[in-house]
């Protein structure tokens, strides 16, 4: 594969290929080598112009994308991201990761991703509404409940999802589950806002139970969290509910480090949620910054002190190799990515070396640890298809079961095809990559995508 202008996609591709080639998979199934050059190319890439009107009446233009990467297991499924950094490399990386993440859930979903370089920050609600509707007017021809089902991601809130859903309904004159993350009154699912954050915590609980053979739980564990969007917010709340101590939360402007022994408390997380609803920064809260330690322009990892667990929940490549080494020195034993590819390639290498050598910082990759969001999106699709709504408890139980299954798939496949190192802790990175790849490759062969 030669794509020097697509560094994020290259990184994601090399991670998958590295896991597979370093394992025994191709010794057992040499025919699967033929899949790699095929699976690395999207089935379809859409790029389109989005023109919209700002509050001053000016015509504005942005670029929109949808990468429909792989549909062997089901309709394309993956979020839409509105952020000025969005480009084809980032969306191909996210779509590629989504293929394997969706496969791990066991639900009938293919992989895709989309978005635009539109920046919601600094825009009025009316401008965001007009852009969202204009975006859907370009995208609606290529999506549908049986074809491609987008959802939210960075910059695409429930407000945006609902305006896109409404525009699709008007354009198609039909009421269907064409997007997920909808309002409960319009076919949304219980637990969807919480799903990714809750899922990360459920996954970490299985890591702790597996490693300690049930002797330890989350209770009393010190947790560093980055980000302050949905994933970070609900991961923090679930950690607190499980008796853990949340030591940090952050945004693009800086990090808030807890100064109290109890860590951040639910009321403070809810205050941060209210700030984010107004598209404000943590730094805008004088009370939080006075009670705790706010560091402008910083990330948690080298500032948080001694911790047991790190949950990167902000964006890709947010943990560098140096920060990974610092986390290990600070006593970190578990890292679970709430963000997609949250650890840089160098950080993954540091964590995996630690795991294999016996120091034992155990990394859970995003495609496994943060699959809870798309899992509940899949459950929302199922509810829409049945014209039914499941209770909060029903969806939460299904989410917990899916996260347990993903963990068990990852450990079982890693144990079968990979060397676990001196401490016999299986590589969740390799296990998740290989387990997802096996499912997709088998389905692709069944539908004639390779032979």
UniProtKB/Swiss-Prot annotation:
Keywords: NADP, Oxidoreductase, Phosphoprotein. Homohexamer. The modification Phosphoserine is found at residue 252. One of its GO terms (molecular function) is glutamate dehydrogenase (NADP+) activity. One of its GO terms (biological process) is ammonia assimilation cycle. PANTHER family: NADP-SPECIFIC GLUTAMATE DEHYDROGENASE 1-RELATED (PTHR43571:SF1). Belongs to the Glu/Leu/Phe/Val dehydrogenases family. It comes from the Eukaryota. Its EC number is 1.4.1.4. Coiled coil: none annotated. It holds the Pfam family ELFV_dehydrog. The gene is gdh1. The keyword Phosphoprotein applies. GO terms for cellular component: cytosol; mitochondrion; nucleus. It is an enzyme of class 1 (oxidoreductase). It catalyses: L-glutamate + NADP(+) + H2O = 2-oxoglutarate + NH4(+) + NADPH + H(+). This is NADP-specific glutamate dehydrogenase. The active site is at residue 113.
């Amino acid at each position: 594969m030669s794509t020097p202008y697509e560094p994020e996609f290259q990184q994601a591709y090399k991670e998958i290929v590295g896991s597979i080639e370093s394992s025994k998979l191709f010794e057992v199934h040499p025919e699967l080598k033929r899949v790699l050059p095929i699976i690395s190319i999207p089935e379809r890439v859409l790029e389109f112009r989005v023109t919209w009107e700002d509050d001053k009446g000016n015509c504005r233009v942005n670029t929109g994308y949808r990468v429909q990467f792989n549909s062997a297991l089901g309709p394309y499924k993956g979020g839409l991201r509105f952020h000025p950094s969005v480009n084809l490399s980032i969306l191909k990386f996210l779509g590629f990761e989504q293929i394997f993440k969706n496969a791990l859930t066991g639900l009938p979903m293919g992989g895709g991703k989309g978005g635009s370089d539109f920046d919601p920050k600094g825009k009025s609600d009316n401008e965001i509404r007009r852009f969202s509707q204009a975006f859907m007017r370009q995208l609606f021809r290529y999506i549908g409940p049986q074809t491609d089902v987008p959802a939210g991601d960075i910059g695409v809130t429930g407000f945006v999802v609902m305006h896109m859903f409404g525009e699709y309904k008007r354009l198609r004159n039909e009421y269907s589950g064409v997007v997920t993350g909808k309002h409960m009154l319009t076919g949304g699912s219980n637990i969807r806002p919480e799903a990714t954050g809750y899922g990360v915590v459920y996954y970490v609980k299985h890591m702790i139970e597996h490693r300690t053979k049930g002797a330890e739980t989350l209770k009393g564990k010190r947790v560093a969290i980055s980000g302050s969007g949905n994933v970070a917010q609900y991961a923090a709340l679930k950690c607190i509910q499980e008796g853990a101590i949340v030591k940090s939360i952050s945004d693009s402007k800086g990090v808030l480090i807890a100064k109290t022994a109890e860590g951040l408390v639910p009321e403070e997380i809810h205050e941060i949620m209210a700030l984010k609803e107004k598209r404000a920064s943590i730094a805008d809260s004088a009370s939080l910054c006075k009670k705790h330690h706010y560091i402008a322009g910083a990330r948690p990892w080298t500032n948080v002190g001694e911790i047991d667990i790190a949950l990167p929940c902000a964006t890709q490549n947010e943990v560098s190799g140096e920060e990974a080494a610092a986390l290990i020195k600070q006593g970190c034993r578990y890292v679970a990515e709430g963000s997609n590819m949250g650890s840089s390639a160098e950080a993954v290498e540091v964590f995996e070396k630690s795991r294999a050598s016996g120091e034992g910082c155990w990394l859970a990759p995003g495609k496994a640890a943060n699959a809870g969001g798309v899992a509940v999106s899949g459950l929302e699709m199922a509810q829409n298809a049945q014209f039914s709504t499941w209770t909060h408890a029903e969806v939460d139980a299904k989410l917990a079961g899916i996260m347990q299954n993903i963990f068990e798939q990852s450990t079982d496949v890693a144990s079968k095809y990979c060397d676990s190192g001196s401490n016999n802790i299986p590589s969740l990175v390799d296990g998740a990559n290989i387990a997802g790849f096996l499912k997709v490759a088998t389905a692709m062969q069944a539908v004639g995508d390779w032979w």
